[in-house]
């Protein structure tokens, strides 16, 4: 009887160890990514080196017609059921490009709404340029201080695996920077047979594949975009200091020179939307 119990116990232990090893092999890079989450003296500012495969090359080939499709892709491809916490919130914001006293180009942006932690996410994809992007965790329903704990491996922190798809602004290794902002009006012209991207994945697509503003504009105009309410426009700037705002108009996608943008349309002086007091 004792031998039988011992045998059964050994079998269960072997199964448990085998399951654990398989889990580690399947999720090693995801676990490594979650564990490297760091915090700083600045309140609710985090950084993350992203080691896992976030499947972006595959994603931009097929795209997502709306945020729901993007969320479903993330759940299946990235988190594999580890994290389910996703929501999409609206924003108001400002962005501008200036030179400092040394003649260096500075790209600035802010979010004009309530509390939200930010994870600065560094990625270095095999088929694209290295970049650092800001992921606003308010999009992922983090609304309380201290919800995210650095160096913790838990289901709450597993949500950071979604960060590459919630890049609201960032800069790549060539100094190309980009941000997305709400605006009052947008008319979308469809490009036949082109994939559709969400606003945040459009930023990542550009920053992983363009070195300067000209390359960014060309890439930008080769994709459709899902502009669910509120509508959006984009600021793009490169290391030379050149900056443009991309807007969707009755005439299609328009890129025009501007060093400041908030939440109203700049094209054709329509000025529809909010944020004129910040402009």
At which residue positions do the language-model features occur?
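A sequence-level detector of short, solvent-exposed, charge-rich linear segments
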Residues: 126, 225, 235-239
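Noncatalytic linker/hinge segments flanking ATPase motor cores
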Residues: 136-139, 146-151, 220, 259, ...
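Extended amphipathic alpha-helical segments with heptad-repeat/coiled-coil character used for oligomerization
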Residues: 230-279
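N-terminal mature-domain region immediately after signal-peptide cleavage
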Residues: 7-211, 226-228
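Short, well-structured alpha-helical segments that form the helix of a local strand-helix-strand
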Residues: 213-224
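Generic ordered-secondary-structure signal
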Residues: 93, 186, 201-205, 209, ...
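Positively charged n-region of N-terminal signal peptides that target proteins for export
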Residues: 1-7
